[in-house]
Amino acid sequence: MAQLTLIADGRATAPLGLPGGFALRSPRAADTEKLGQLYFDSRVPGARHGDAAEAIQEVRSFFQGEFGDFWPGASGVIERDGKLVAALLAVHRAPWDDTPDCPFITDLFTDQRFRRQGLARTLIIRCLTQASSTARPQVALRVDSDNTPAMRLYQRMGFGLRGPE
């Protein structure tokens, strides 16, 4: 399975209304364990790598800056009844040489029970809207080429294959 880098132009978009009972806010380092558990649980069993402890450590590494400078305004978590059900983690720029010089979504994940309700779309709109007001008004991300549902979502949201720089 190959990873593809996709990029979209940032644009101010009216936010989607969340379904009743959901709340959107910026993630905090205090959310690390809950985010890590959600990250692990959101993966289908065949696609999981490692265990919940490794997922929590990956989120901890994100907040420690290992994936770039955390951008709280473009990132988001969605809660329902006090439980995290979806998250998008973004940085001002990814630290890897092969990524575009623009904001980058490092992770986007949704509890399997809450998929197809517009939560990921709402989080992406928040990120694209924030990016639209920056000097680098684009957003990039990586996705596994065989992740058809994610590819469809990203294409509908305006993401396309990264062209030459």
Feature locations, PLM:
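Conserved active-site alpha-helix within GNAT-family acetyltransferase domains
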Residues: 1, 117, 121, 145-163
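A short beta-loop-alpha structural element at the N-terminal edge
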Residues: 23-37, 48
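Helix-loop element at the rim of GNAT/NAT acetyltransferase active sites that forms part
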Residues: 37-53, 66
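Conserved beta-strand in the GNAT
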Residues: 75-77, 83-92, 104, 109
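Conserved acyl-CoA
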Residues: 104, 111, 122-138, 160
